Amino acid sequence: MFIGQTRFSLFVPQSGSWRASNGKKLSSEADYRAYLYDPQRMEFRTNHFIEHTVPLLAQAARGHEVTHIVSFSESLPQRWKSRLEEAGQQYDFLWLDERKDGEQAWDTPQAVIRASGHTGVYGSYRLDDDDMLATGFFDAAQPYLAEPFVGMFVSFPLGVEAIFDGTHFSNFRLAHVPMNSMGLMALCSIDAEKNIRAPKGGPHDLTDRYSPVILDARHVSYLRSLHDGQDNAMRYQDGSVLERLLHETGKNPPLHDYDQLASAFPTVAARIDQGAQEFAVGEAVGEGVGFALAEQGARGVADVTIVLSLNSEEPIGPEHFVVYLLVVDAQGRKLPRHQAVAGLKSIKRGRIGHCHLMPVKEGQSRVVVSLHLEQGQSLQGFCVKGLEPKAQKVSLETVSVAADAAFHSVDAARFAALVDHTPLRVQDRVHDLLVDRWDSIRAVATRVLGQQRAEWALAKLRLLYRRIRRLASR
């Protein structure tokens, strides 16, 4: 048996946790209440919980005995209580737990397990209203419901992080975070006299200081939705939350296996597919199959998810298969290769700048390229390319583009022309040229001038290079 709990915007002004996470922006109980029950915040979280968190729990619970507690305060506005009550009627595994203001509700899981009549081992987990557990979560946890593991925790560190704006999911990254809060499970037991044995707990990221912790990262087990309304993001400066999140998650590898994403989180895949443009291609990628904004002169898109259906006779390594992304700044100027873009790589090969490099499986597969660009940056087009002969033989069956602007397909030559005609500042062009040709410049200088004079000349060139970098950063 599994007992879970979501503490749904509980009003607990005496709690130290909200004070620690809000960056001292909320100085009074009235400020806290206004923040907690802000209509925009509640709409976002309630929609996420009812449209994603709960339906995924329902799928994961098939074949398992699961009770999921939703604890909320009596002061929760009726509008949101009604939404929870409707969900409780639709999903019989939900246990609605209304508490007096100020109550933490930490004792509810033990009260529920005692009332259930269950005896033996059970798992007790927690889940925030803006996170999700994968459809295979309880299948993965079931083997640990055994007597030898009682008194331990099991943590499932492998998951996905994604930006969510209330409508679109984007920027999917693989994350490995031991003892994260998503589904951290205490392995407990209860006997016929209602006596409970449970591991000693503490702050989730310090769980192993209190009790033994089993780590199982064999499967993707959770999706963490990142958004500018996160409670623990209040410490950031106003307007910088998403930028911080992009740079933090950009350190993690992108998730490219769309079939894995769709299997673990079907509600997220359905949201991506909803309203996406579909292109039937049915040809080898060759030296490039391009896509550009359909409306000439239109502003690019900052949030886009691209799904490619591929068919390959053999597996292709990520260094040989690329989706080149034409990213521009607020003035419509091409971003130079030397300029870092959160979550994207930049390579010199084949006149390619910012991109996603990805592996291709043998046979049929679907891969996803998803990005959420920083403020002032946008995508004008993209090109799917093979960087070696066997990669160029990969068949691109279909392309799906989920974005707030229309795209149309173009051949490799037209995409190259689009790249060439997108303006690039002179200092950026010189900078890219120096970076690209530095090794050959060094070799020629050494051959013509000799080692000592070449080093002197290159030192002068480095000074020029630094000045150009300063100009390029303005």
Residue ranges, per PLM feature:
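N-proximal low-complexity "stem/linker" segments adjacent to membrane-targeting elements
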Residues: 1-52
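Active-site-proximal specificity loops/subdomain of glycosyltransferases
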Residues: 30-39, 80-122
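Short, acidic, metal-binding catalytic loop of nucleotide-sugar glycosyltransferases
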Residues: 54-65
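Short beta-strand/loop segment that forms part of the nucleotide-sugar
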Residues: 65-75, 97-99
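Conserved catalytic core of nucleotide-sugar-dependent glycosyltransferases
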Residues: 102-117, 134-213
